[in-house]
C-alpha cells in the first residue's frame, strides 16, 4: 500500500480552537475541517486544509484524517 501524502511536511499553525482543544495536524483523525490546523500563510490561496476520507489499509476501512495540500498541485 502506498501511504497517502497528507501534507505533514507543510508548515502549519498550531492554534487552540473555540472548544479549547488544539487543532489537529495532518494525519490526525477528524470529524470536520474546522478541527484541522491551517497551513502557515493560509491568507494566500496556495494551501488548503480539510478533513478528508482516506482508506486505511491497516484498519481495512475508511477513516477521516486532516490533510493539507498545495491547491496548484495534483496532490490536492
Curated annotation (Swiss-Prot):
Pfam families (UniProt xref): Cys_Knot_tox (PF17486)
Tissue expression notes: Expressed by the venom gland.
Chief place of localization: secreted
Keywords: Disulfide bond, Ion channel impairing toxin, Knottin, Neurotoxin, Secreted, Toxin
Disulfide-bond pairs as recorded: 23-37, 30-51, 36-66, 69-76
Subcellular location per the Swiss-Prot or TrEMBL entry: Secreted
GO-annotated molecular function: ion channel regulator activity; toxin activity
Gene Ontology cellular-component annotations: extracellular region
Free-text domain note: The presence of a 'disulfide through disulfide knot' structurally defines this protein as a knottin.
Sequence similarity: Belongs to the neurotoxin 21 family.
Stated role: Insecticidal neurotoxin with probable ion channel impairing activity. In vivo causes a rapid, irreversible flaccid paralysis that results in death.
Protein name: U1-cyrtautoxin-As1c
Organism per entry: Apomastus schlingeri
Amino acid at each position: 500500500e502506498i501511504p497517502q501524502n497528507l501534507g505533514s511536511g507543510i508548515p502549519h499553525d498550531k492554534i487552540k480552537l473555540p472548544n479549547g482543544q488544539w487543532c489537529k495536524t495532518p494525519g490526525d483523525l477528524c470529524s470536520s475541517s474546522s478541527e484541522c490546523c491551517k497551513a502557515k500563510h493560509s491568507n494566500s490561496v496556495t494551501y488548503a486544509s480539510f478533513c478528508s476520507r482516506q482508506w486505511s489499509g491497516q484498519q481495512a476501512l475508511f477513516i477521516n484524517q486532516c490533510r493539507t495540500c498545495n491547491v496548484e498541485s495534483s496532490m490536492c
